[in-house]
Design a protein with these regions (language model features):
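Short, C-terminally biased terminal segments at protein or domain edges
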Residues: 1-104
Length: 104
C-alpha cells in the first residue's frame, strides 16, 4: 500500500511513518509472546497498542489529507481498530487488569 502512494514529499513522509509504526506492531507482539514476565508482556503489548494508535493516525492523515482515499485505507484503518481491541483484550485476559490496557 505504501509503495502505491503518490510520489510527493508529503506522501513519502506519511508512508514512511505508517510503514514504521505498522511493522512495529508485529515486532512488539512477537516480543510479547517471548516475554519472561507478566510485566514485560504488558509493556510490549502496550507498546504494540501505541503503535496501532500511531498507525491509525497516519491512516487518518492519508484519508483526510486526500493523499490516498481508497477503500484500502479505510479497510486498514478498520483492521487497526480491530487489532487495538484484540490487544486490549489480550492484556486484560493475561490478568493484568483493565487499568493496564491503554495506559501508557
Amino acid at each position: 500500500m505504501v509503495t502505491a502512494l503518490q510520489r510527493t514529499p508529503v506522501a513519502a513522509v506519511v508512508g514512511r511513518q505508517l510503514l514504521r509504526s505498522g511493522t512495529a506492531v508485529g515486532a512488539n507482539y512477537r516480543e510479547a509472546l517471548r516475554s519472561r514476565s507478566k510485566s514485560e508482556y504488558a509493556a510490549k503489548m502496550n507498546i504494540g497498542l501505541m503503535e496501532l494508535e500511531e498507525s491509525s493516525y497516519w491512516l487518518e492523515l492519508l484519508d483526510e489529507g486526500r493523499i490516498s482515499t481508497g477503500a484500502e485505507v479505510k479497510a486498514l484503518h478498520a483492521e487497526a481498530n480491530e487489532l487495538s481491541a484484540i490487544f486490549v483484550s489480550m492484556i486484560r485476559k493475561a490478568g493484568l487488569g483493565a487499568n493496564s490496557a491503554g495506559k501508557f
